[in-house]
């Protein structure tokens, strides 16, 4: 993540937008030496918002920890078991 003063960004905004749009890079923009804004690409912003949404769901952290423990102890299900459980037929080859 780069930190740049607003004076650097002003004349080259298009260039910096292109840079963050094509990467997961973020640019912290300072004003009078203090952080004032962060420039991120739209895809990265959407991803961050989705992550925040899921992390805000009650019990999600516990569910993830439980799933990790299941995987670590070998309690997993194969494709055939999942398809049978939910009544999903196999795809034709």
From Swiss-Prot:
Alphabetical keyword list: DNA-binding, Repressor, Toxin-antitoxin system, Transcription, Transcription regulation
Molecular-function GO terms, alphabetical: DNA-binding transcription factor activity; sequence-specific DNA binding; toxin sequestering activity
Description of what induces expression: Expressed in log phase cells. Also expressed in human macrophages 110 hours after infection. A member of the relFG operon.
GO biological process, one term: regulation of DNA-templated transcription
Pfam (any one): PhdYeFM_antitox
Cystine residue pairs: none
Quaternary structure and interacting proteins, as annotated: Interacts with toxin RelG, which neutralizes the toxin. Also interacts with toxins RelE and RelK in vitro, in M.smegmatis coexpression with non-cognate toxins increases the toxicity of RelE but not of RelK.
Similarity section: Belongs to the phD/YefM antitoxin family.
Function: Antitoxin component of a type II toxin-antitoxin (TA) system. Upon expression in M.smegmatis neutralizes the effect of toxin RelE2.
Protein name in UniProt: Antitoxin RelF
